[in-house]
Amino acid sequence: MFPKIFLTAATALLSAKSTFAQTYSSCNPLFTTGCPANTALGKSIDVDFTSGSVNSFDGSGDITYDSNGASFTVAKSGDAPTLSSIFYIMFGKVQITMKAAPGAGIVSTLVLQSDDLDEIDMEWLGADDTEVQTNYFGKGKVTDYNRGAFNPAANNQGEFITYTIEWTSEQVVWSVGSTVVRVLTPATADTDQYPQSPMQIKFGAWSGGDSSNAAGTISWARGPTDYSNGPFTMVVQSIDVSDYSTGTQYKYGDQSGDWTSIEAIGGSVNGNVPASASSIQTAGAAAVTSSSPTIPAGINNGNSATRTGYPWVAGTQTVSEVTWSTGPSIPSGWEISSEGKIVPVSASPINISRINPLLLCGPFTFFFFAAIRRWP
């Protein structure tokens, strides 16, 4: 029989999982007042998927775990295995170590996206293992999809490579290994398009080349996808996330979408920015791939879709109608550990210096001094 304290903890954990599954809402702060605050990470975590799953990332689709890490498999039409953080960051750094999925039309994706549809992306097309596409959007405005750029990432399907997105109020820096491949600043971004609101993190694989997609999407993904050549698997070894702000929640102060309007409840925006992040990178922004649309506007713009259509979900909403799920929250009394696990908040350690030393000397000594009412 388990001790009662273990049973209580188990019950609480089950309740926590139930909370994760039920507390979803969709609200775009640009169009709606009173949107719920976003759960803040407020710290740094290092998640090792070779040790299994963690409950700070909510999974959907076919995801398995082994000594290589988390595997995201696309085997048939409609498959889009995804892990989504239950937390948000307000500026920060995301480092993912992974192998991209092979296959024409197959897309491996890392997305940072906010409730008001700011977005920072890295996407690997399975038809070419030598490059990665970097992209960004602001407030859900796709204009003519003219911001994507392809950057070198040799042998990205054959070996584990660490990719980094570092995002501050002054710049977004994309890196492959230790090499900076692209830099974006507010000055070089399209007007009012610099990403600057709290971001949720999603990553996984999907089929941009699926026959049900629009012709523009299939062409961009270098499809079509031939599922008989599959299954197609993306493998993620680890993900490290550092939130450059502090607090428990991030809240939109108005409908501007400007970072200066974001409130960090119980902390401060930019309260955890390392000195290294303050230096402006000198690498030039990579050239865009095209000035014409490669994915028609309005395609795959469902409640959970990014501007490039990930995760793959059929939808017909226009960009202005799109909302974004705020994701699950962390139950009261629980926190995210440095390994990315949801755990009970630890009890405060006992401060030995505040304990009267007589309590450590045995009952006779204690009661002797208590009787004469004189304490050392």
Swiss-Prot record:
A lipid is attached at S346 (GPI-anchor amidated serine). Residues 1-21 form the signal peptide. Transmembrane segments: none annotated. Residues 347-376 form a propeptide. One of its GO terms (cellular component) is side of membrane. PROSITE patterns: GH16_2 (PS51762), PROKAR_LIPOPROTEIN (PS51257). Residues 22-229 form the GH16 domain. Its main location: membrane. The active site is at E119, E123. It is found in: Cell membrane. Disulfide bonds join C27-C35. The keyword rRNA processing does not apply. It catalyses: Random endo-hydrolysis of N-acetyl-beta-D-glucosaminide (1->4)-beta-linkages in chitin and chitodextrins. This is Crh-like protein 4. It comes from Botryotinia fuckeliana (strain B05.10) (Noble rot fungus). The lineage of its organism: Eukaryota, Fungi, Dikarya, Ascomycota, Pezizomycotina. The gene is crh4.
